[in-house]
Structure formats: structure tokens, C-alpha cells
Design a protein with these regions (language model features):
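Interface amphipathic segments
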Residues: 1-222
Length: 222
């Protein structure tokens, strides 16, 4: 079901889709609502399974500017992966046309965390952005998305992104504890990464080491 109508200066829309309780991954009911006015867009998405459990309930405000766009998330207590999280009230992520990112976003639930935080410049390093992900259960994430394969494992990431004069850099660690893909165990993955891209990312320097179950499996330098 889909509907679009006008209320004052706003264009309002709603989209609903349902399926039987035999649907892939148990997806049963998905509702998308929102409105558009000028350069502002509001989107709300809610998903339930066959047992009427809410797997996802979250909204996004999007503002389009001449040389950037800004997104913020609501409410302060969204549901993600069947759990009720807390989002900082002043959350905001702005992406500029040169891909500079200004962010203040922190989503937390028990020992789980998704954080994007802009940091002050440090020497030649400017536009610093800390990306921190802790304790994310991939199984719950893939259960609410029909587009992802069946995965399980606990994701953690600690990355620093920055600009050093005309070089884009990234350094840190990405790991998954006890990763399973389509019910087949792949192991515990641990990737240490350093990357530098110059000349609009056409010139690359990469240094990474991949370990699986604490055994070094791949090393790339160059």
C-alpha cells in the first residue's frame, strides 16, 4: 500500500508492505512514512516480525544544503535489532561536497556502541573523525534486513579518519569475534589497517595485517 498527499506546504507519503509468517527471515510488516518540505525530508521506518515484535523503529531528518547535507536521528530511544537504544539528543552528521564529515553521534545499548565523533585538528591532521563500533551482533542485524546474507559474530571497530594536507588517511582496527557465514564458521577476524590516499584517491598506500583465530593470514604493504 502506498499513499502520497499534500498537507499545507508539506508533501506527506506512506508506504506499507506485509507478508506471511513464512517470509524470508520472518519479515512480516514494514511501514515507511515521512514528509518533504523545501530542502527538508523526514523519514520514519518501522518493521515487525510475524510475532509482532518490533525489530526496527527509527527516523531520520535530512536537510539538503547547497554544498552539504545533514542527517539526524530520532527518537532518542529508537529500536534497533529488537533492542531499545539511546541516541544523544543533539546528534548530527554533516557531509560536505568534498566528503569532509562533521559528526556528533552516539548510539548505545548496554555494552553496544556506535559512535561517530569529530575531533579537533592535531598538527597537520585535520578533519579528524573517530569511528567506534563495539559489541554489534551481526546476527540480529542481518535478521532485520532481507538484503544481507546470514551472518553471526560480534563486530568491533576503532578507526581514525583524517586529512593530512592533500592526503586522506585511515588507521585503526576492524574485527569480528567468532564470525559465521551461512552457518559456516569463518573464525575470529582481526584486521589492523593503515591507509593513505592521494590525488583524489588515485594514489594509494596501504599497510594492513589480517589475522584469523590469532594466526596471521595476510599482510599487505605498498
Amino acid at each position: 500500500q502506498m499513499g502520497i498527499w499534500q498537507t499545507g506546504k508539506s508533501l506527506v507519503y506512506a508506504l506499507g508492505a506485509g507478508s506471511s509468517d513464512q517470509a524470508w527471515k520472518g519479515l512480516f510488516n514494514i511501514n515507511l512514512t515521512g514528509k518533504m518540505q523545501g530542502n527538508q525530508f523526514r523519514i520514519e521506518l518501522k518493521q515487525k516480525d510475524a510475532r509482532q515484535r518490533v525489530g526496527f523503529d527509527m527516523g531520520i531528518n535530512l536537510v539538503m544544503l547547497d554544498s552539504a547535507f545533514t542527517v539526524s536521528f530520532f527518537p532518542m530511544t529508537p529500536i534497533l535489532g529488537y533492542s531499545r537504544w539511546i541516541v544523544n539528543a543533539d546528534n548530527k552528521v554533516t557531509v560536505y561536497k568534498d566528503w569532509k564529515i562533521d559528526a556528533n553521534l552516539r548510539m548505545a545499548y548496554q555494552n553496544k556502541l556506535v559512535s561517530l565523533q569529530s575531533l579537533p585538528d592535531e598538527g597537520e591532521r585535520t578533519d579528524r573523525l573517530q569511528v567506534e563500533i563495539t559489541g554489534i551482533d551481526l546476527k540480529k542485524l542481518t535478521e532485520i534486513s532481507p538484503f544481507l546474507p546470514d551472518l553471526s559474530g560480534i563486530l568491533h571497530t576503532d578507526l581514525l579518519l583524517y586529512t593530512d594536507r592533500k592526503t586522506f588517511g585511515a588507521e585503526g582496527n576492524i574485527g569480528v569475534n567468532n564470525l559465521f557465514y551461512e552457518e559456516q564458521r569463518m573464525g575470529t577476524l582481526d584486521l589492523d589497517l593503515q591507509y593513505a590516499g592521494k590525488d583524489h584517491l588515485t594514489d594509494h598506500a596501504v599497510d594492513f595485517e589480517l589475522k584469523i583465530d590469532s594466526i596471521r593470514r595476510a599482510v599487505v604493504q605498498g
